[in-house]
Amino acid sequence: MAIALSTLVEEADRYLDAARIQDYCPNGLQVEGRPQVRRIVSGVTASQALLDAAVEADADVVLVHHGYFWKGENPCVVGMKQRRLKTLLNNDISLLAYHLPLDLHPEVGNNVQLARQLGFEVEGPLEPGNPRSIVLLGSLAEPMQPADFARHVRDALGREPLLVDAGQPIRRIAWCTGGAQGYIDQAIAAGVDAYLTGEVSEQTVHSARENGISFIAAGHHATERYGVQALGDYLGKRFAIEHLFIDCPNPA
């Protein structure tokens, strides 16, 4: 079965409420390809490796969390950017990208999907009155020692996490996929036992140690694989078209 590209884009935009959310990049259709869609390939980032895999898979649309045209970047279509865009245009493949809308969504969002992967019970956002609050609060079904929790994260995500061990059991936790280490002080203020995100900065470790909470950096890529898969699955089922998630491993 095939559907119109415009129909797919309209549904993805509507489902994620993309127009409501201010972001650092355009959300939605970033590169237009052929007008009919039979197969979606999804991935975390619109890297050359993913594009090449999409060409090999005969995809009509590439669906990603990290697309192109970021605020403040050089707009010139040269080098890596030229090669990526050339691959899409030469093969008549569309690029569909959702950044913050995919972090925030209550069903297919990165943070909700990560909670399901790790077995967290979701309480709600860290900042309930802030519509752009992407950090979630929740708890573990049973308290875990930090080292045991880190092993649980490793087994679930297939990547060894960085652990700052506070030496106290973890029950209440805050988390945000990707590069959200800057929210650690807000997580501390919320009284959590641990904060989990994808990346770590030098000062993050000091904040965790000096405030007595555990911190886990589980990988930017590793924590953000699940939202785009869930969105692709939703669109595939919604329109009875094919969806294939392709993981291009990234140690970051």
Curated annotation (Swiss-Prot):
It comes from the Bacteria. A divalent metal cation 1 binds at residues 65, 103, 224. A divalent metal cation 2 binds at residues 66, 220, 224. One of its GO terms (cellular component) is cytoplasm. One of its GO terms (molecular function) is metal ion binding. Signal peptide: none annotated. Keywords: Metal-binding. InterPro entries: DUF34/NIF3, DUF34/NIF3_sf. Homohexamer. Belongs to the GTP cyclohydrolase I type 2/NIF3 family. This is GTP cyclohydrolase 1 type 2 homolog. It comes from Pseudomonas aeruginosa (strain ATCC 15692 / DSM 22644 / CIP 104116 / JCM 14847 / LMG 12228 / 1C / PRS 101 / PAO1).
